[in-house]
Amino acid sequence: MRTKTRPLAIVLLVSALVATTVPAQLVVTSQVASASSATPSSIWSFDEFAKHMKNPDVSLSWGGDFRVRNEYFNNAMSLSSDPAVSPLFGPNHEQEYLRFRGRVWASLYPSNNVTLNLRLAAEPREFLKPAFSDTFFGSTGMQWRYGIVDNLNVQWKKPFDLPATLTVGRQDIFLGDGWLVGDGTPEDGSFTYFLDSVRLTYVLQELHTTIDAIGILQYARPDEWMPTIGSSGSVPGQPAGLLLTDQNEKGAILWVANKSVPAANVDGYFLYKHDSIYLSTLAPYGDNGDIYTIGGRLSGLPQDHWKYAAEGAYQLGRKQDPILNQDGENAQLPSGAQTTGFRDIDAFGLKGKLTYLFKDEWNDQLSLSAEYLSGDDPNTKKDEMFDVLWGRWPQWSEMYNIYSYVPETRVGQTADLIRFGPTWGVTPVKKMDFSLSYYALFAGEDTPTRALPFAQPAFSDSGDFRGHYLQAILKYKFNDYVSAHLWSEFLWEGDYYTKQQMMDFLRAEVMFTF
């Protein structure tokens, strides 16, 4: 990290600490004719003041947050610092930038059962080194990105006196632990994560069962059906402009969750996703496909000190991927597997986590995680790559399963992965959490069939060990309004990669919430 920006993390954390001393002592006096006429009942604590400000009337509530991040990484997306191996990203293998995300939201309650929800968001970024992606590629300085209506929906509780909730519009949807449904906008990098959708949640109280039926219509462009605040369109050399996701998407979800047995919560689901290429003239963007996913999840607390979660899913359907199905011969495929049309999908994924809760003074926890996502076999005309659908978010790594998959598949399109290892979590002092994780990472297939043409030299095509992954996270919540964290990740590359260099990722964050 550059010397002049290295103190930023310290400055942010110190400012947060100073900010926390104010609410504890601040009192706000209600409007009176003079200060001397104030009575004890007219003096509010900061918490009371904030509550009254955010809920000025029974028909309105509002709030906001402001997130500041300083992020640095090296080789995470280029996979190597050698331009000969990574000609596009190699020259910009080292990245440092600031992210300033602001959001404000409001809810209107026209009746007891109906709520109108609105949220606006914007995240300008300042690149301290030449930018690595999108319309700002190769530039430094402030990137004044667009603002967007991040949420806009109507929620109707107990429609027609049914034990249900109907939500229509732009909304956040997170099912299970987000493995396959958690983020509808992976291309904007945690700036937003909404899905344009209709969701009906039906509760069978006596059966301890919840049924979710969801329909999705998601566009690649952020201004497709609702204008953005500021330009999000194309610029010379970047005809795609800024994207939310890689293709236009339609989907249907049926998700049933039963919690009758605390030791064995059962989820079963069917997911359908239809992909339609956004720009037919741009091979790297998106795919055409119809993906059908059938899966289930089991989780619970079988004993006082143990908890677990296990999930598995199988996929079928068909997909046409421009990167794989390009005109002419694909260098990654043998002659018998060449195709330019749709391929039948035959893929599956598994994941699990077992945690021991010490329940001691420091709240020690020790977990063992494992995950398998099938990869595409280059020797067949089928598509064996498991698609994580709307799960392209940093589920276990802010670095590897987001940036490092860009040359291999797409942003957050984690696939062809075998991952296992432990995590230790502890709360050494009140409001502070620390965790340390190690994962051994492997590939089921040693040839990344979807690697971008300019990135193929970065892969050895002969090894299956992705590398040793290490993560350390320190979080602290100062109060209800200020929190912060320090985040670090490292990967020592294995023989899956040509150069076998080290990747690293560092972040300092402060979040202000009102």
Segments the model singles out, each with a brief description of its role:
Residues 2-95, 105, 109-111, 362-366, ...:
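N-terminal periplasmic/intermembrane-space "pro-region" immediately following the signal or transit peptide
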Residues 27, 160-166, 184-380, 427, ...:
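Signature for the C-terminal beta-barrel architecture of outer-membrane proteins
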